[in-house]
Amino acid sequence: MRSRKLTGGVRSSARLRARSCSSTSLASAGDIASSTSAKTTCLASSSHKATDRRTSKKFKYDKGHLLKAELQKVDPKSDISSLPKVVPVAPCENKFAEDGAEAAVPAPENTAPPQGCSKPVSEEPSVKAEEGLPTAPRSAAAAQETHDSSASQAEPVPVLQMDSSVFLDDDSNQPMPVSRFFGNVELMQDLPPASSSCPSMSRREFRKMHFRAKDDDEDAEG
């Protein structure tokens, strides 16, 4: 009986050991799995960060290229330099060249000059030379007329300055504005002087008459 009990105890202890070993192995396997999962998550996050950095770098590079392309499109100097330069041609030169080409071929004489390149020549000097009339006096008369007209324009026209006040200051020695009471002064200046009814007398005669009148008054009072 004791041997059976011992064998049963040995068996039970072996079973317990096997169970404990299996539990420890399971725990270690769980720890390993958790560590591997943590490692995988760290690797995944690091890979995501690396991909984000790469995409941001690519985006910045693409942006820089787009900006450069837009600047090259907007820059007007490159467009102007690429265009061919056109040299302006004067119309008179072309007409002179055509006239030279026509002169090589015999053609009837044209009295009218080309339009826009030369002024028509007046025929008055030739007619005057044929008639034998002098041209200098006419030019002198024209110069005198121009001089007289310029002198008349240069002379200032007198402007009548009207005073705004009816009576001037009492302290001033200036006369009253006549235009306020008698109208336009310029019309009065052209009138002839008024003729006096009595003959003019000298100052001495006037004084003598004055003193005589005084003496007569005194005699009458006395």
From Swiss-Prot:
The keyword Transport does not apply. The modification Phosphoserine is found at residue 172. Keywords: Nucleus, Phosphoprotein. Residues 33-48 have a biased composition (Polar residues). Residues 23-57, 98-158 are annotated as: Disordered. GO terms for cellular component: nucleus. It is found in: Nucleus. Disulfide bonds: none annotated. Signal peptide: none annotated. Residues 121-131 have a biased composition (Basic and acidic residues). Its main location: nucleus. Belongs to the UPF0688 family. PANTHER family: UPF0688 PROTEIN C1ORF174. This is UPF0688 protein C1orf174 homolog. It comes from Rattus norvegicus.
